[in-house]
C-alpha cells in the first residue's frame, strides 16, 4: 500500500493518508466479534484507494469491504460493517463521533424546522436533561449492517435532496417516545418515555416506517393502512378517487372496495344509458393510485376487492395477467376476491355459481357481509327468478380460473368475508367488514363516501406495531409490552392529522390498532419446534393467547383511565363476546392446549369498563422493520440462512438470528414439504387475532409431476385455509429456480405502509 498517497479531508484540505488511523478504527469496530479479520477488511479496501480520495470515500470503501465479507461462516462482519457505518453516520450528522446533548440537539433541529416545535413547548429544559440520561448511545452498536442502511435510507431525519443527515438512531427512538407521551400527566410521562424508549431501542417493540420516519417532525401523518369503500354512483366513484389521491400522497397503502359497482350493460336512469361496467372505473382508480410518486421512488399501491359472484367476475379475474390488450387489463393494482361458505359449498358439491350485477339483486350485496343465512336465502331466490339478468358457471371452473390467476400473478388475494364477520370484534348488523387493506391483515368496517367531505362515509385507518418474539424470554413480559404498545399507538391517534373527515371521525371513534409479531421463525427455532410437523402448534396457541389477552387487558385498563372508545357499543366485545367464543372449532383437532389466562374476569371487566380500542391485533408483513431489529420477517419462514435484499440503498445481506447455534433448527421456506403445517399455525393464530393475518401460500413446482402444481393441490390449500378459519390469503409464492436468498425489498407495499 502506498503510504504517500494524498487524501482530501472533509474541509477540502489535503494530507498524507494515515493508515494507522484506519487500522485503529477497524480494530475498534472488530472488538468482541467472532471470526472477523481486520487485515482482510484493510486488504480489500486498500486496493480501492487512489490519489486525492476524499476521507468520506475512504470510510465508505472500508464499510463496503466489511459488508462484502458477510456470510454464513462469518456472520459477525454484519456488526463490524454496522459499527463502521454508525461511526461514519455520526461524523456526517455531528462532525464527530460523540452525539451532542439532547436538549442542544432538539433546539437546533427545531430551529432548522426539521423537528416539531411542540417538542420544546411540551417539555421543560430540566425534563430534556432527565431524558438525556435515559439514552444509551451504545445501543447503536447492536444494529446489523442491513439495519444501519435502512435507518439511513428510510428513517433518520434528513434532507432527501442533498443527502444531509441530522440525527442518529437513539435520538430517533427517544424523540418518538417523547412525542407520543407528551400529553400524559407530568408526574408519569417521563416514566412512560423511558420505558417505551427502552422497549423500542432494544427491539422488543417494532414500529412501522411512517412512525419511525415521521413522529418528531412537523408532518403528522402516520396512517399505515387506509380502507376506502366505493358505492355504485358517479359521485361516490369520484369521491373514492379523490380520497385515494390524498392518501397515496401521504405514503399510505390503499385497500379499495369496488364490489358494489354495477356490471357492464346495466341500465342507467331507467335505460336511457348503457353502463360501461367495472373495468373503466378500475382504470380510473389505478390512475389515482399511481398519480403521486412517494419521494420520487414509485407510485402508490392498492388492492381492489370484489365478490366472486359479480356478473363480470370472469373478466375481472384476468385483469392482472400478461395476456389481453390494454383495454381489458388493469395490471398495476392487486386484487382481493371475496368468497364465503356458500361459494365453497357449491365448489365441493360440484355444482354451479350464479353471477349477478349487485344493482339487479336488492339486499344481496349487503347480506354477503352482514348475514350469511339471509345471503343464501336471497341468492337462491334470485337464481330462480327468470326476470333477473344472470350468468351461470360451473363452480369448479370459476374457482380454477381464480387459482390459476393467483398462481400466475402471485397477487390475486383471497378474503373469506363470512369469517371476517363471524369471528370479528365488530357486530356485523351495525358495522360489517366489507373489505381488507393493501396487505390483507386489516378487517375494519367502512362506509362509502358520496362526496369527499361526506361525514357519513367511513374510511378506515389502522395504526400498526409489533412484538419481537425473539426478544421475549417469558410470556409474562408481554404484559408490560402490551401496555406500552397500546398506550403509544392510542396516543398517536390523537397526535396525528387527518386529511379526510370521513377518516378522522371513524379513527377517533373506533381507535382501531393492529399489533402483530416479527421474528416468529427465530422464535420457533429457539424453542426447537418446526412449521411443518405440528410441533409448534401448542407453543403458538400459548403465545397468541398471551398476546391477545394482555392487549385486551391493556386496552381495558386504558378505558378505565381515559374512557372507552366512542363506538365501543358497535363491537362484539361490548356484548361480552371474546375471540375464544367465536373461533372455528375445527382448530381443536390441531391443538389440545388449554387456555392459561383468566378470560372470564377479563370478560367482566370489559363489560364494566369497556375497551379504549375496537381492535388490537393484526399480523402484517414486516420486511423493513425486521431488518432494523435483525429479525425474521413477520410469521414467515426464511428463504435462506443469509438473505440478500435489494433496495435502493444497495444490496443488503442479513444472517438469521443466532445462526451458529440454531442453523439446524431453522426450517427454510423451500424445505417445507407442503402448506399444511403453516396454514394450521396461521389458523391457531387467527383463533386469537381479532383482525386478519397476511398469510402466504408457497409452491415449489419441482415437487410435482411434470414440474406443474396441480389445480387440486391449489384448491385443497384454499379449502384448508377456509376450514381453519383464515380470514385472508396474501401472496402466492412460486419457486422459480432463481437464487432463493435474493429478495426485492420494495415489493409494492407503499412506503412500507401496511407492513412494518
UniProtKB/Swiss-Prot annotation:
Cystine bridges: 225-462
A GO-annotated cellular component: ribonucleoside-diphosphate reductase complex
Function comment: Provides the precursors necessary for DNA synthesis. Catalyzes the biosynthesis of deoxyribonucleotides from the corresponding ribonucleotides.
Family classification: Belongs to the ribonucleoside diphosphate reductase large chain family.
EC number: 1.17.4.1
Full protein name: Ribonucleoside-diphosphate reductase subunit alpha
Residue numbers annotated as active site: 437 (proton acceptor), 439 (cysteine radical intermediate), 441 (proton acceptor)
Gene that encodes it: nrdA
Record-marked site positions (Important for electron transfer): 730-731
Description of how the protein assembles with itself and partners: Tetramer of two alpha and two beta subunits.
Coiled coil, from the record: none
Activation and inhibition: Under complex allosteric control mediated by deoxynucleoside triphosphates and ATP binding to separate specificity and activation sites on the alpha subunit. The type of nucleotide bound at the specificity site determines substrate preference. It seems probable that ATP makes the enzyme reduce CDP and UDP, dGTP favors ADP reduction and dTTP favors GDP reduction. Stimulated by ATP and inhibited by dATP binding to the activity site.
NCBIfam families hit by this protein: NrdE_NrdA, PRK09103.1
Residues noted as binding ATP in the record, renumbered to the chain: 9, 15-21, 55, 91
GO molecular function: ATP binding; ribonucleoside-diphosphate reductase activity, thioredoxin disulfide as acceptor
Amino acid at each position: 500500500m502506498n503510504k504517500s498517497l494524498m487524501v482530501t479531508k472533509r474541509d477540502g484540505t489535503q494530507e498524507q493518508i494515515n493508515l494507522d488511523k484506519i487500522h485503529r478504527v477497524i480494530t475498534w469496530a472488530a472488538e468482541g466479534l467472532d471470526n472477523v479479520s481486520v487485515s482482510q477488511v484493510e486488504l480489500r479496501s486498500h486496493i480501492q484507494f487512489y490519489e486525492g480520495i476524499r476521507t468520506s470515500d475512504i470510510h465508505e470503501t472500508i464499510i463496503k469491504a466489511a459488508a462484502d465479507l458477510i456470510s454464513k461462516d462469518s456472520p459477525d462482519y454484519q456488526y463490524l460493517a454496522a459499527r463502521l457505518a454508525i461511526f461514519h453516520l455520526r461524523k456526517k450528522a455531528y462532525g464527530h463521533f460523540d452525539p451532542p446533548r439532547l436538549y442542544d440537539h432538539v433546539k437546533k433541529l427545531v430551529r432548522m424546522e426539521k423537528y416539531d416545535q411542540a417538542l420544546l413547548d411540551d417539555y421543560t429544559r430540566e425534563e430534556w436533561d432527565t431524558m438525556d440520561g435515559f439514552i444509551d448511545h451504545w445501543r447503536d452498536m447492536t444494529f446489523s449492517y442491513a439495519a444501519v442502511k435502512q435507518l439511513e435510507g428510510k428513517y433518520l431525519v434528513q434532507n432527501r435532496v442533498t443527502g444531509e443527515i441530522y440525527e442518529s438512531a437513539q435520538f430517533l427512538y427517544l424523540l418518538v417516545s417523547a412525542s407520543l407521551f407528551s400529553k400524559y400527566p407530568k408526574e408519569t410521562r417521563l416514566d412512560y418515555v423511558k420505558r417505551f424508549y427502552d422497549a423500542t431501542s432494544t427491539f422488543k417493540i417494532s414500529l412501522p416506517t411512517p412512525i419511525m420516519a415521521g413522529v418528531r417532525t412537523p408532518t403528522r401523518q402516520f396512517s399505515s393502512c387506509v380502507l376506502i369503500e366505493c358505492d355504485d354512483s358517479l359521485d361516490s366513484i369520484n369521491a373514492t378517487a379523490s380520497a385515494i389521491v390524498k392518501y397515496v400522497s401521504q405514503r399510505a397503502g390503499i385497500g379499495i372496495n369496488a364490489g358494489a359497482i354495477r356490471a357492464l350493460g346495466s341500465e342507467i336512469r331507467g335505460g336511457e344509458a348503457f353502463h360501461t361496467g367495472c373495468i373503466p372505473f378500475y382504470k380510473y382508480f389505478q390512475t389515482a393510485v399511481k398519480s403521486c410518486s412517494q419521494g420520487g421512488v414509485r407510485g402508490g399501491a392498492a388492492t381492489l376487492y370484489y365478490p366472486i359472484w359479480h356478473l363480470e367476475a370472469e373478466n375481472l379475474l384476468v385483469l392482472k395477467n400478461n395476456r389481453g390488450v390494454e383495454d381489458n387489463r388493469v395490471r398495476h393494482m392487486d386484487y382481493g376476491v371475496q368468497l364465503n361458505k356458500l361459494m365453497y359449498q357449491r365448489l365441493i358439491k360440484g355444482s354451479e355459481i350464479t353471477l349477478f350485477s349487485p344493482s339487479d339483486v336488492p339486499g344481496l350485496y349487503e347480506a354477503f357481509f352482514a348475514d350469511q343465512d339471509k345471503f343464501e336465502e336471497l341468492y337462491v331466490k334470485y337464481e330462480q327468478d327468470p326476470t333477473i339478468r344472470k350468468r351461470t358457471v360451473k363452480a369448479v371452473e370459476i374457482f380454477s380460473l381464480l387459482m390459476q390467476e393467483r398462481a400466475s400473478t402471485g397477487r390475486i388475494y383471497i378474503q373469506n368475508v363470512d369469517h371476517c364477520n363471524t369471528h370479528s370484534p365488530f357486530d356485523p348488523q351495525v358495522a360489517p367488514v366489507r373489505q381488507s387493506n393493501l396487505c390483507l391483515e386489516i378487517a375494519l368496517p367502512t362506509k362509502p363516501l358520496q362526496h369527499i367531505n361526506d361525514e357519513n362515509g367511513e374510511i378506515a385507518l389502522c395504526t400498526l406495531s409489533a412484538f419481537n418474539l425473539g426478544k421475549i424470554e417469558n410470556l409474562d413480559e408481554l404484559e408490560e409490552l402490551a401496555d406500552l404498545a397500546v398506550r403509544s399507538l392510542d396516543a398517536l391517534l390523537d397526535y396525528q392529522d387527518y386529511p379526510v373527515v370521513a377518516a378522522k371521525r371513524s379513527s377517533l371513534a373506533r381507535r382501531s390498532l393492529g399489533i402483530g409479531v416479527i421474528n416468529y421463525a427465530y422464535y420457533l427455532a429457539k424453542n426447537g419446534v418446526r412449521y411443518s410437523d405440528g410441533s409448534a402448534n401448542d407453543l403458538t396457541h400459548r403465545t397468541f393467547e398471551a398476546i391477545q389477552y394482555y392487549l385486551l387487558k391493556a386496552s381495558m385498563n386504558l378505558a378505565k383511565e381515559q374512557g372507552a372508545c366512542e363506538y365501543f357499543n358497535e363491537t362484539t366485545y361490548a356484548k361480552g363476546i371474546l375471540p375464544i367464543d367465536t373461533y372455528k372449532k375445527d382448530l381443536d383437532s390441531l391443538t389440545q392446549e388449554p387456555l392459561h389466562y383468566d378470560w372470564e374476569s377479563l370478560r367482566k371487566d370489559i363489560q364494566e369498563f369497556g375497551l379504549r380500542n375496537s381492535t388490537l391485533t393484526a399480523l402484517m408483513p414486516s420486511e423493513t422493520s425486521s431488518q432494523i431489529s435483525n429479525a425474521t420477517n413477520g410469521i414467515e419462514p426464511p428463504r435462506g440462512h443469509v438473505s440478500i435484499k435489494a433496495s435502493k440503498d444497495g444490496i443488503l445481506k442479513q444472517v438469521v438470528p443466532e445462526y451458529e447455534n440454531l442453523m439446524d433448527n431453522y426450517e427454510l421456506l423451500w424445505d417445507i414439504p407442503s402448506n399444511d403445517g403453516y396454514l394450521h399455525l396461521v389458523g391457531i393464530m387467527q383463533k386469537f387475532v381479532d383482525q386478519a393475518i397476511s398469510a402466504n401460500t408457497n409452491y415449489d413446482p419441482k415437487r410435482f409431476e411434470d414440474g406443474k402444481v396441480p389445480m387440486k393441490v391449489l384448491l385443497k390449500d384454499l379449502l384448508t385455509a377456509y376450514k381453519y378459519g383464515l380470514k385472508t390469503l396474501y401472496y402466492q409464492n412460486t419457486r422459480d429456480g432463481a437464487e432463493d436468498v435474493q429478495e426485492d425489498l420494495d415489493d409494492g407495499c407503499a412506503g412500507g405502509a401496511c407492513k412494518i
